[in-house]
A protein has these predicted regions:
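The conserved cystathionine-beta-synthase
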Residues: 80-98, 104, 194, 258-277, ...
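A glycine-rich helix N-cap at a beta->alpha junction
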Residues: 50-71
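N-terminal beta-loop-helix "entrance" segment that forms/cooperates
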Residues: 36-56
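Conserved small/polar residues in nucleotide/adenosyl-binding loops
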Residues: 302-306
Length: 306
C-alpha cells in the first residue's frame, strides 16, 4: 500500500497539527499500514512549544499535493566519466537498457549527455582517419577496445597527432604513405614494422597475435613509437579502433535540459512534450545528477491518497 498522508487545514494551529499526528498514529496501529502526519503550513510558536514539551517531531511540511518529479519513479543509472570509451558506453547502455547516459564529473555535476543517436552520428558522419587524434584518445582506451597489450609506450599517454593508416602495401610504397605520428595498423612483416619506425610513426598496432621481436621493441622505444599488440586481424582492428574515442568528444554539451525534484509533473510534461528527447536527467537541490526519467515514467506516476 502506498503511504496515506494525514493533513489538516492551511496555516495550522495546535489542534490541526496534533489531530493529524494522533489520527495518523491511530490508523497505523489499527491497520498496520503507513499513515504519515503532514502539515499545510509553518508551525507557530505555541505548537512548537507543545511538540517540544512532549518530544514529538513536527509533521512533514507539504506545500502542495500537486505531483512533483520527486514522486516519479525514475531510473537510478549512475553517470559515466567523460574519458570512458564509446565502446564501454555502448555496452553500458545495452546492459542497463537505456538510450541516454549522463556524463558527470567526480562530484556528479553534469558535463554532457550521450545518446545512441550521438554514437550513430559519429560513426556515420564524423569518424575519419583523424578522429582518434582529434579526440586525444588515451592509449588505455585503445588497448581496451583492441583487447591487446601495450608492448612499448605509456598507457597514460594520449594519441594526439596523426592519422590511422593501414599498412597494406610493400615497404617502398609505405614510405610515401605513412606520415609522422601516424597510427599504423599492420601484421607480422618485419620490413613493414621497421618502415613505420623509420617514418616516425606515433604508434604501431600489430595484429593477429604476432609476437613483437626484441629488435623492433628496442627501436620503437628509442624512437618514441608506441606498440600495441592485439589478437585481432586487420579488418577487425579497423572496425573497432574508432570505438576508443572518449565520450567527451561525442557527447552533447550545450542546451541540456535538466529538471529538479520539486518541479511539478504538469510543468515538466508541458516542457518535454515539445521535445523529441527520450530521457532527461534529474538533478538534486545541489545540482548533482541523481538519475534519468522518461515521458513514460511521468505517465506511470503513482498517486498517494490523502
Amino acid at each position: 500500500m502506498n503511504p496515506v498522508f494525514v493533513i489538516g487545514h492551511r496555516n495550522p494551529d495546535t489542534d490541526s497539527i496534533c489531530s493529524a499526528i494522533c489520527y495518523a498514529e491511530l490508523k497505523h496501529r489499527m491497520t498496520g499500514e503507513p499513515y504519515i502526519p503532514c502539515r499545510a503550513g509553518h508551525v507557530n510558536t505555541e505548537t512548537k512549544f507543545v511538540l517540544e514539551r512532549f518530544g514529538v517531531q513536527a509533521p512533514r511540511y507539504i506545500k502542495s499535493f500537486e505531483p512533483c518529479l520527486s514522486d516519479v519513479q525514475y531510473r537510478r543509472i549512475p553517470g559515466i566519466d567523460e574519458e570512458m570509451s564509446l565502446h564501454r558506453a555502448w555496452n553500458y547502455m545495452n546492459e542497463n537498457d537505456i538510450q541516454t547516459l549522463a556524463v558527470v564529473d567526480e562530484d556528479r555535476h553534469l558535463k554532457g549527455l550521450l545518446t545512441l543517436g550521438d554514437i550513430a552520428r559519429f560513426y556515420i558522419e564524423d569518424q575519419d582517419a583523424n578522429a582518434l587524434a582529434e579526440a586525444k584518445t588515451s592509449y588505455r582506451n585503445l588497448v581496451d577496445v583492441l583487447d591487446g597489450t601495450l608492448e612499448v609506450g605509456d598507457i597514460d599517454q594520449r594519441f594526439e597527432q596523426g592519422s590511422v593508416v593501414v599498412a597494406a602495401a610493400n615497404p617502398d610504397v609505405l614510405e610515401d604513405y605513412i606520415g609522422k605520428n601516424d597510427m599504423v595498423i599492420l601484421g607480422n612483416r618485419y620490413e613493414s614494422q621497421l618502415c613505420a619506425i623509420e617514418m616516425s610513426a606515433g604508434c604501431m598496432v600489430i595484429g593477429l597475435g604476432s609476437k613483437v621481436s626484441r629488435t623492433i621493441r628496442k627501436l620503437a622505444s628509442e624512437n618514441g613509437v608506441s606498440i600495441i599488440a592485439t589478437p585481432y586481424d586487420t579488418y577487425t582492428c579497423v572496425k573497432v579502433i574508432g570505438q576508443a574515442v572518449p565520450v567527451r568528444h561525442v557527447m552533447r554539451k550545450k542546451r541540456l535540459i535538466t529538471f529538479e525534484p520539486e518541479e511539478t509533473v504538469e510543468d515538466v510534461k508541458r516542457t518535454v512534450s515539445k521535445k523529441r528527447i527520450r530521457y532527461y536527467p534529474l538533478m538534486d537541490e545541489q545540482g548533482r545528477y541523481v538519475g534519468m526519467f522518461s515521458q513514460r515514467n511521468l505517465c506511470l506516476l503513482y498517486t498517494s491518497d490523502a
